[in-house]
């Protein structure tokens, strides 16, 4: 086995669930609609490996990584959880230990497309960064600069 992972249920938001085509009328379960889970839209912090690249993780490593995801449970609604995970994905895509608010603002168009009813995307980005800071996921370095904390970057 090369890779084996789990994703905590609180990372499942409507945006990652892709509806499949319904079964044909001649199928035993005609009309049944399944789904695919698009794990590419789940932040790396939400992917908890038991086995990674053929190397088995220790129980303590797995439990520690799992406990670091608890902050996602704090999001009250599915919509706020979606925003939180979307902003976290943007931060991970920057791929730098330290990043600026302007770096995250670079994803404004992407976030606007995902959340078309929100006309204050920059304010929402700042709000989510504050939440991530308060939950210990990122550190505020100063003057619009942040540092990723959990994934060892």
List PLM regions with ranges.
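Basic, glycine-/proline-tolerant helical and adjacent loop/strand elements
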Residues: 1-3
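Positively charged, polyanion-binding regions of nucleic-acid-associated proteins
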Residues: 78-98, 130
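Glycine- and acidic
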Residues: 88, 110-112, 151-153
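Eukaryotic modular interaction domains in large regulatory/scaffold proteins
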Residues: 98-100, 110-111
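A short acidic, leucine-rich amphipathic alpha-helix
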Residues: 103-105
